[in-house]
Amino acid sequence: AFEMYSHCLDIYPQGAATLYEIAKFYMFLNQPDKGERALKEAVAADPNNYWYNQTLAAYYQNKGEAAKAIYVYEDMVSHFPKRLEPLMSLVDLYNRTKDYQQVINTLNRLEERDGKSEAISMEKFRMYLAMDNDEQAFTEIENLAKEYPYDMRYLTILGDVYMNNGKEEEAYSIFQKVLKEEPGYAPAMLSMATYYEKKGEDSLYQAQLDSILLNDRVESNTKMNIMRQLILRSEQTDKDSIKI
């Protein structure tokens, strides 16, 4: 088959399909340089073929050549506006190279093409935190909490963001709202414990932890983690951990 494809290229060197197939042969024969060259020629011969472009981009990505992979995927975004996969690959690549602003830019492009989603908003929230851009992180999680007002996860995260940025009373109000809606919601209960700890209210902090440990709705793994934290806290303050 290899000889047949080689003969076809002798007759018509610009045959994109033939170049693509022979590129795969070169890769199989562990001749990556020749395979890469044939792949690039296949893309040049038929730039509108999605799979030729995808194979070349994936080759660069697997080889660890992020810049080259990004270049191909960015070109694919322009050539194939209805395909979301190139944008998703770019999110991953920009993440790996720690180019967080480009991650956000790419997520915005995903939103423009596919609409707003929880996953995109949460990823943007994480990126803003990684960039120490607390104001934008606030905005992103606030919008998400407004869009999903009955999802206790986002309200609790919003409360945590408030608390970590000096807005303790706003955080307290949110945690109380969550626990009124869902009394046994462990993340909000833990956040309340953290709130009391930050305020220096040790008795309320301890009482909150006790309520978590005694709550049947809280998973055993969460309780075990709390026990570990209590033991560590006890040891650090020279108390007898056996009392716990």
Tell where the protein language model's regions lie, with residue ranges.
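Short coil turns that delineate tetratricopeptide repeat
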Residues: 13, 47, 81, 115, ...
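Register position in tetratricopeptide repeats
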Residues: 28-29, 62-63, 96-97, 130-131, ...
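Canonical positions in the second alpha-helix
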Residues: 8, 41-42, 75-76, 109-110, ...
